[in-house]
Amino acid sequence: MYYCISFTHKNTDIALREKLSFSNEAKKSEFLKIISTHENIEECLVISTCNRVEIVAFVKMACAEFIVKSLALLCDVDKDILLEKADIFEDSGAIHHLFSVASSLDSLVVGETQIAGQLKDAFAFAVKNNFCGVHLSRAVHSAFKCAAKVRNETQISKNSISVASVAVAKAKELADLTQKKAVVIGAGEMGELAAKHLIAAGAKVIILNRDLQKAKDLCERLGVLSEYDSLENLKKYLNQYEFFFSATNAPNAIITNSLVEELSYKRYFFDIAVPRDIDINENENISVFAVDDLEIVVQKNLALREQEARMAYGIIGRETSEFFRYLNDLALMPIIKAIRLQAKEYADKQLEIALKKGYLKKSDKEEARKLIHQVFKAFLHTPTVNLKHLQGKMQSDTVINAMRYVFDLQNNLEGLNQYKCEFDMENNDEIY
């Protein structure tokens, strides 16, 4: 069954989320290797962003305690606290949650489109490292289809905002950014988003990054209203400008009290990183806004999107039902075919026995074959119709398993791929 363990801004604070975050691929790989050794876990992937850690898996049976214990040990967090905080979803609930995440209905900023790229990256990493197979591939691709349908059929992503844009919006409330210089620390996706929103607000940006070439490349994309420098010169910039937006993947705070001097003018620090980049004392001239603080601004946008969100949840509900209907269809049709094939084989076998024993003339063989086939087709007609009527219904799994047992079909369904995937595992590409 599908399984999901979720830690988000809804059930954990930023201090706990930053401990759980997977800031590098090595840590993510280590965790997935650990949990994939469990006998009940067949496939798994991890989505890790500033606002969430999602463990998505395909399992034989529930194993939340093992997964959470593994996460707690790796991240040095109390297991009982994690179990208490975790939202756990099973099967249809897990798929509905995954579709909601992909469609940005579960985001801090409803309608932001960043999560689709983050899910794609998480999926690609899991596929590349052999943690993800056909089960999760089918689910993730269906999640992408659902997200596209939500975007196309609602206005949920119109004028969409991210945490970075919320930070810039908050800065605009504090001062006119026109012609001001703002320092963006980090040249990754979140840093780039912040820089773009700042430029759109009329500000000029200075990109600071450990990798100078990456900062230069970002400035080339941003255009003439940007410049760049090495993160080594951070202290100089911290004590020269007013607005700072920090979005690095550093494991520890990079802006500390030792770097920030007392100045006569106000400075505003926006920490949009998880783990947090900024650990300084606030005073009358220094204000710090972390990810959770920005939720206040986010709330102002939620009312505007409430109606669209209701429409989107309707789509997600229908797509979740359709997903399981499709899986049931994939399972039922080969069983119907296998039963008919089994009946045909038995009929042909008995016909040959009758011919050998002289119960039937060779000249009557074809007519007898037609008659026998018509009989078993007529006999199987009602069971076939009833099986088809089960498609998409809750009891279908029970009936499918019963039919496999009764007709001894366990080893006769090699052609059945219940979780048919639309992802080329060799080339990491879609094969629609």
From Swiss-Prot:
Possesses an unusual extended V-shaped dimeric structure with each monomer consisting of three distinct domains arranged along a curved 'spinal' alpha-helix. The N-terminal catalytic domain specifically recognizes the glutamate moiety of the substrate. The second domain is the NADPH-binding domain, and the third C-terminal domain is responsible for dimerization. Pfam families: GlutR_dimer, GlutR_N, Shikimate_DH. One of its GO terms (molecular function) is glutamyl-tRNA reductase activity. This is Glutamyl-tRNA reductase. Its EC number is 1.2.1.70. HAMAP family: Glu_tRNA_reductase. Belongs to the glutamyl-tRNA reductase family. It catalyses: (S)-4-amino-5-oxopentanoate + tRNA(Glu) + NADP(+) = L-glutamyl-tRNA(Glu) + NADPH + H(+). Homodimer. Keywords: NADP, Oxidoreductase, Porphyrin biosynthesis.
